[in-house]
């Protein structure tokens, strides 16, 4: 019994299947090797050493390493939101893509400044970790970063300028 022409067109030949399988294997393997060489897997955890995969972060890592925060806080403890996992991973992914874009286009600034969204996250995390201190002593816990932008208070780093990264001149 001869094959029906419609069946021949719907199901590719064995040679085509093998070729497609090899090409897909090479693409997936190359992509996996590329991601491994970029150390992409290090960004899935909270290890601060991942932040120095990019050379521009080395001075910030070094100053954090010599600060009191290095004993108790990772980069993600301060720089990533902790309200829920979705918000954390979305922020981490978007921020990471901005960093990759700046790195690939060589447009990263000499001295990194937190953008408004990052500053909001950082201040929220200062308040989250230092809740008793901020509520009992300085009333900072009752304001947020957006209020500081309109003059209704100060951001934590307005007074604590060298926390946790210290003076860059001290390196």
Locations of regions flagged by a protein language model:
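Short sequence/structural segments immediately N-terminal
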Residues: 2-171
């Amino acid at each position: 019994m001869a094959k029906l022409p419609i069946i021949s067109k719907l199901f590719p030949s064995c040679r085509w299947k093998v070729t497609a399988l090899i090409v897909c294997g090479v693409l997936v393997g190359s992509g996996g090797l590329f991601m491994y060489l970029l150390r992409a897997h290090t960004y899935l955890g909270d290890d601060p050493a991942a932040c120095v995969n990019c050379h521009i972060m080395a001075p910030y890592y070094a100053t954090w390493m010599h600060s009191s925060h290095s004993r108790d806080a990772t980069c993600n403890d301060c720089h990533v939101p902790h309200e829920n996992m979705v918000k954390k991973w979305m922020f981490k992914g978007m921020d990471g893509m901005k960093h990759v874009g700046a790195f690939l286009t060589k447009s990263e600034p000499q001295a990194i400044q937190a953008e408004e969204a990052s500053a909001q996250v950082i201040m929220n995390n200062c308040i989250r970790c230092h809740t008793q201190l901020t509520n009992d002593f300085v009333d900072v816990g009752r304001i947020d970063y957006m209020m500081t932008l309109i003059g209704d208070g100060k951001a934590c780093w307005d007074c604590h300028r060298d926390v946790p990264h210290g003076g860059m001149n001290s390196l």
